[in-house]
Amino acid sequence: MKVERRTIEYIPNEERHGKAKDLFPVWFGANMHITTLVTGTIPVAMGLNLFWSVAAIICGTLIGAIFMASHSAQGPQLGIPQMIQSRAQFGVIGAILPLFLVMFIYLGFFASSTILAAGTLSSFVPIPGSWSIIGLSAVCFLLTIFGHDLIHKMQKILSWTSFAVFFAATILIFQLPIPAGSWIPGAIDLPIFLVAVSAVATWQLAYAPYVADYSRYLPVKTPASKTFWYSYAGTSVSSIWMMLLGALLTTSLPDFTANSGSQIVQLFGPFSFIMLIIVLFGQMAINVFNLYGAFMSTTTTLEPFLKLKVTPKVRIIMILGVTLVGTVLSLLGQSNFMELFLNFIFFISYFLIPWTAINLVDYYFVRHGKYQVKAMFDVNGPYGKVNWITTIAFVLSILLEIPFINTSFYIGPLAKMFGGGDIAWIIGLAVPSVLYYVLMKPRLKKRAGYQEKLSSL
């Protein structure tokens, strides 16, 4: 296995390979781990019964995956990482604003997945949790060095092996006793249901900043519809499956979230070592995703200032740097995981949703997929240093979300007025979409008209 040569630059046609169907196992495997499963416990932890928890999981996944897969479809056409493409909206320097937020997301998910894996490992092997975190992080660091192709291969292996093992786990979990009436709809607590849908949708949206990184090597003529549907199907099927198991386990085992990995491994009795291997492999596989994304974002952030040439040595140093930061976060967060994880999920949604709205409106409705890829690497090019229209729309959208926020550390006044319902995600989608389209479309038309006049002289 060779170390990946490319980083944030355009992938030339002669290096393109693979088919759209290869994306199904990538995104199916990306969710076949216990962090996804723990996300499925959130609706139950909020107070919904099993029926409404499953409904929230299905609704949130199917809605969130639309945005995730729409980003994936950009990869083959542009041949660059997702966050480089953000320079077309924010400007070459301005894109650093969402990049910082995205790096926080990668490292946050790295920490949460590492904590879960370390807790599971330490339950079966006499190793302190902190040393488990350090050891697992080291393995992820080594795997991330190889890059794109190894990640694809790991996800294919994980897809098949985890399918077989979690199929058996599903049979065992459905045999566990659950409280009477858990599947009866009953009255819906709409505010809590909306919060749960938002949390689940955020799981899918969290893939948006790097989903195109794994489709950018596909041939440029790959149909966008195939890229979309293979990504959508892969992530939706596995997410709903894992989150359903999480909701069932929380309903059956009230203390499940105290050590989720250990409890699901113990279901296999004398064959628990098989499940232990799958759990650890799944956590490491998704953490390679997270480290790769953090590395790409770091490179994208530094490139306008340093004009980096990412040699193998530079690559290793940068990946080591993000691994160390993620490891420190894991060590600091292991004592109060569930509360931190829940707040983290909600926190990132308030920033991710406006970004994804702007990016998709620009790609599909403003520029219609037509970009000057070389110009995205030129600070003095047509995309400029900072696009103030985008920056203002992005920041204003976040500010307008605040009154609608409902978290454990802050409840906005309008969220209280609506009985605790968190509709900040609706504001985060609608406001930047309208603002960006209304302000940016005329500006581009005016620029195009001016260029036509120049060319006719």
Curated annotation (Swiss-Prot):
Membrane-related topology note: Multi-pass membrane protein
CDD domains to which the protein is assigned, alphabetical: SLC-NCS1sbd_CobB-like
GO cellular component terms given for this protein: plasma membrane
Sequence intervals crossing the membrane: 24-44, 50-70, 90-110, 127-147, 164-184, 192-212, 228-248, 264-284, 316-336, 341-361, 392-412, 420-440
Swiss-Prot/TrEMBL keywords: Cell membrane, Membrane, Transmembrane, Transmembrane helix, Transport
Major localization class: membrane
Highest rank taxon of the organism: Bacteria
Cellular location(s): Cell membrane
GO molecular function annotation: transmembrane transporter activity
Keyword hit for Transport: yes
Xref: InterPro entries: Pur-cyt_permease, Pur-cyt_permease_Fcy2/21/22
The family this protein is said to belong to: Belongs to the purine-cytosine permease (2.A.39) family.
Name of the protein this chain belongs to: Putative purine-cytosine permease YxlA
Species name: Bacillus subtilis (strain 168)
Top-level taxonomy: Bacteria, Bacillati, Bacillota, Bacilli, Bacillales
